[in-house]
Amino acid sequence: MRLNFWLAITALVVAAVHASTLTPSVLPLIVRNPYLSIWFNHARGYPWANWPMFWTGSTVGFAVMAAVPDSNTVYPLLGRSQDFLGRSSSYNVSFPKYHGASFDASTTNLTYTIKGTDLKITLSFLSPITPTSTFRQSLPAGYLTAFVEGSHDVSIYIDVNGEWVSGNRKNQIVWNFGKSTSRSSGTPIKTWSIRRQDEQLLTEFNDHAEWGTIHVSAPAGVEHQSGEAHHVRRQFAQDGSLKNRVDETFRGIFEEEPIFAFSKRFKLSKKSNSSSAAKDSVRFTFALTQDPVAQFAAARGLTQMRPLWASYFHSAEELIQYHFDDYETATFLAHNYSEQLAKDAYASGSRDYQDIVALSARQVLGATQFSGIPDSPLIFLKEISSDGNFQTVDVIFPAFPFFLYTNPRWLEYLLEPLLEHQKSGQYPNEYSMHDLGAHFPNATGHADGRDEYMPLEECGNMLIMALALANAFKDNPRPTFSQTPPEEAIALAAGPVRLPNSVDAYGMDRSFEEMGTTGEKAAVEWLARSYKLWKQWTRYLVEEALVPANQLCTDDFAGPLPNQTNLALKGIVGIKAMSELAALIGEKEEAKYYGFVAEEYIEKWQDYGLSSDKSHAKLSYTWRGSWTTLYNIYADALLCFHLPEDGSSLDNGRFWNTKQAPIGGASKPHFIPDKIYKAQSDWYYAVLQRYGLPMDSRHLYTKSDWEFFAAAVTSKKVRTEILQHVAKWVNESTTDRPMTDLYDTEGTGHFPGIYFMARPVVGGHFAFLALERACGGKAVEGLKFLDEAEPTDIDVQESLMADMARLEEPPRKMGEL
């Protein structure tokens, strides 16, 4: 039974070879958190042309080779090992035929054939996304499986160096070689463990962690060797094998560069026959263990936070063994997620959309660290590559559609550190904080209140995410993805913490019902715990949202601007969200009040924020002849304020029975009128550029997260056009780092002088997928009117000039607004 299951899993993994059509410039290999983040750069070229890289672009020593004894030839497969081989009478160096890369949400496959043979080699890198197993998602580890097929003998080799454990290449490293003891249910394995000689806890150098140990494991039957890079790689090239020797002279990362290698020989010639080629594989695992993972100014004070996995295992060795043996289950769950994601993306967008969200998924989770305890997990998030802040609210916000789609509870675990810290009184301002700390992994807070000043932005973000999460708990209490592990799943052994209520014996998340509650009860309880904060932040919005002061929005690189139309909309939708939050926990009078304020503000906002011909939203109330991508309108649809007109008025809250008094005595079918959705959809169609939708009229650069927020609430035709333009950028972009969210929509699609890379905000690419699940599946139905007519033909220049012509009119006094 286990063999059949293994064959089925193998077929699933290799099938991913055919799963992608786009050709991004960089692909994820092993990406689990901000410090275990290995990428294939220049991914449109040969994998042996460059070394793999850390997300910053710095190289990482990681080589894979194949040796064919019949011809005494060694073939570099990944990394520039050929630079170390030189010329020799003992072996030949050649390159395989490379058939390209393919990927799904969890897997990247590189496929090769060897000239003059029937050998086929697939390197399959798996960083499993397991939405129904938070336990597995928390494991800081990934897999490389080498699949071989043919009738010729072949050996596979891998090595790593000290660049995995320090950004300062002058540092000294130490290492250990160990073997696990055979267990009744465990696979005997060998492990290289490498770390800095003098670790610096919770410290970074060029964004690399300066503490922690990388563990590289393989089955006990493989050969191993450590030593100077030239010597070890030439040893494999010469013999197709290693000497099972350990270099015990600790030294610097590039001091007679020590590397740590495994090799595996496959006797395929003895297994194949005339009717079929032999197939085999070898698995390697890579785990970066760090304890602590962060320090956090929690309610109890500054605390060194342990990794979540430490609640399940007594030691790193236990973690490594379980992870190695759990490959089949992790693969099964990851494939289930990838397959469902592909189906949903194709149904709602296109084949290109499949690839874009698949490419984005690991990047989102690559910014996270899982901490806390099993019944109260926390997810910490690094604002990768921009400021490096800890738990940045306006980075979580663009990423949150990914979490709503994948596992809404993970969004709860992201928001909880922000709520706990602010409820404890450690943040002095009345508005929501921007982040928990100036630099990850240190969430020491901002007791002086001098974090980056984005008060309106962050208050709106927190309230919108709070209601979206509550709705998700209520409407979709059970995840779409598989909650049943395969029969071969390995039960968790007794760990330091007794088996939690939220996790079953096989590490699968329990549903709300299995935990003795319901999604709606869980939503109410979660909201009630922080109700004081929700009210506090809404008071700020009531005072400041309608006419925003000169302040930053999340797009802070563009600078501050007063009267921002899009920012005001976020604040007003945030007030509307508060009316629903209040209603959900039974505060009916407050719900009515905030609902009334929101309705009054949205009426005025339409007057202030739209162009004179009502064809588009202005960048700023007072900036005539400007336009903006109105991405914050997405929240209106996501929060169920724009449901189909089926006889039930939206003036009735979704969670309470008292009717809100309508503005002006007339019932409104929608919070934001259809005409604004239609106008923006048509406008986007008119201003599209070669590589997508510019952010606003100031520049030709764009933010891909906001492109997808905007596209989610346009007509299908416009959405398809935006997707196709972004897909064209993915295929043609000259950017050479993990997918940027900020790029030029013209020229070469390069960075616009600001280098964003590997940021979790690409979770915004899931905006339409999250919208399809919102409101019990009814959110997208409320937007079907957009498909009833073709986009209106707009003369953009004429519209902008007409708006500017009104500059001669007396300006409105903002004090009278």
Question: What do the predicted segments below correspond to?
Answer:
Residues 22-53, 455, 462, 622-645, ...:
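C-terminal capping/lid segments that line or modulate ligand- or cofactor-binding pockets
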Residues 20, 136, 152-154, 158-393, ...:
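Acidic/polar, glycine-enriched structural segments that form the non-catalytic walls/loops
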Residues 165, 364-372, 408-429, 470-474, ...:
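Long, well-ordered core segments of solenoidal/helical folds
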Residues 27-118, 207, 216-231, 236:
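An extended acidic
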Residues 1-19:
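Fungal secretory targeting signals
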Residues 188-244, 385-395, 401-408, 420, ...:
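Extended ligand-binding clefts on enzyme/binding-domain cores
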Residues 37-41, 64-67, 112-114, 148-149, ...:
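Well-ordered alpha-helical scaffold segments within catalytic/enzyme domains
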